[in-house]
Every structure is written in C-alpha cells, then in structure tokens.
Amino acid sequence: MPKRDAPWRLTAGTAKISRTGNNSRALIMGPSTSRASAWVNRPMYRKPRIYRMYRTPDVPKGCEGPCKVQSFEQRHDVSHVGKVICISDVTRGNGITHRVGKRFCVKSVYILGKIWMDENIKLKNHTNSVMFWLVRDRRPYGTPMDFGQVFNMYDNEPSTATVKNDLRDRYQVMHRFYAKVTGGQYASNEQALVRRFWKVNNHVVYNHQEAGKYENHTENALLLYMACTHASNPVYATLKIRVYFYDSIMN
C-alpha cells in the first residue's frame, strides 16, 4: 500500500526549507546590540546636563592647536641624595616641538622606560626602590633646587620625603610613584618597567629669551625629582619623557 503524500507535497507553490540551514535571528535580523551597550553609547543630547557642562575639552582653555610634543630621552644615575630634571624646557620656534611665544599649557606628561642595575650591583642581595615626584615650581628662579633643599626627610630617607613647610606655596607635588628592583643570586628582579601618563594642564610662562632652560622660566616650571632608597647601591633610569602642550592664544 503506497504511503500518503504529505500535505506540503500537494500544496502548489510551497518551497521546502532545509532544516540544516542556520536560520538564527542574527542572520535574519542583522547584527543586534544589547540594551546595555545601547545605553552606554547613547548620544550626548540624551545624557544629563552635567555630562555636557563639565566635559573635559581636548584643547585647554585659552589655548589653540595643534598639539605639540617635546621628548626628553636620557639615562639617569639615580642615587640616594636624589636628582632633578626640568621637563618643561621648550625652545621658542615655529616647529611642532617648539613654543610660539612666552606662554603655553602642558596638557599631559607621558613617562616610559625602565629602572635597572649594574652588573656588579645586581649580584648583591638587596632591594632598592626608586621614588619619583612630579613637582610644579610656581616661581622658578636661577637653577632648580636640589632634592634635599626641597624635601624634608626623616633620617635622610627619601621614602619619607615631604615638601618643606616654607616651600609649600612654591613647590606642589602633582604626582608621585615608585619602582622596585631586587638584586641577588636567586630571587632577583634586576629591572622594572616604568609607564605613567598624567593630565596636568600646567600653564607655563617664559621670559623674552628663546632658549628652553629652567632659568628662563617665570611661572609654573615642571620638575621631575627622583631618588633611590638604598644608600650605597645606586640604580640607573633609562627614561623617555614626552610632554604634550598647546600654545596660548595670549602670545
């Protein structure tokens, strides 16, 4: 006895659909986003007013583009008594690494590199921490003050360094961090990577001189102090410091 045909065989114009095909909603409806991602990526006009009023601008107030960059690449010998470098030294000129006039704003600072020990020092069993301070000098004059002249320490220990009371109105610690290296035969860590990015928005003012030197600053010089905690074993810091700045419209 022959089997009866299925109803779809008797219906004219009905096409068979393979059951092996992937008929998921993603292929039919296209790529869909979740409600959470749609809420996070909503347009600015749908967000509260505080997001529109207090949004950080790309260009600092009172400045104009383009964004310029100045790099400081050097190997530093970091000792227990400390060291200081000026990272707001920008020469006057017309290039992408020069300032146009006396005033400019350092928007951000990018520090990357490593802390490492010498071949003879890394064999000794010790732990050495390198401390860094990003300091703003509001009234620069002459040459940068040494680490011991700016910071007050207990028992000459850099890890307890704080700005002296009579210099607090002039020197302001904006950021600080440290990196640690360990020497020895077994559990040694002879180098440590350094990578920091900060937004500072520091408005620097120069005098009429064109050279980018600390002695030509008149307001808000940026200084980077560094010191190690071990008294007899110094370390080396190979750093690349990039300063991103904008020229002021008051030039």
From Swiss-Prot:
Domain of life the protein comes from: Viruses
Gene3D superfamilies linked: 2.60.120.20
Motif Nuclear export signal boundaries: 96-117
Keywords noted in UniProt: Capsid protein, DNA-binding, Host nucleus, Host-virus interaction, Metal-binding, T=1 icosahedral capsid protein, Viral penetration into host nucleus, Virion, Virus entry into host cell, Zinc, Zinc-finger
GO-annotated biological processes: symbiont entry into host cell; viral penetration into host nucleus
Key word Zinc present: yes
One Gene Ontology MF term: DNA binding
Chief location: virion
Motif window: Nuclear localization signal: 35-49
Motif (Bipartite nuclear localization signal): 3-20, 195-242
UniProt keyword Metal-binding, yes or no: yes
Role: Encapsidates the viral DNA into characteristic twinned ('geminate') particles. Binds the genomic viral ssDNA and shuttles it into and out of the cell nucleus. The CP of bipartite geminiviruses is not required for cell-to-cell or systemic movement.
Subunit structure, as described in the record: Homomultimer. Binds to single-stranded and double-stranded viral DNA. Interacts (via nuclear localization signals) with host importin alpha-1a.
Family the UniProt entry places it in: Belongs to the geminiviridae capsid protein family.
Protein name as catalogued: Capsid protein
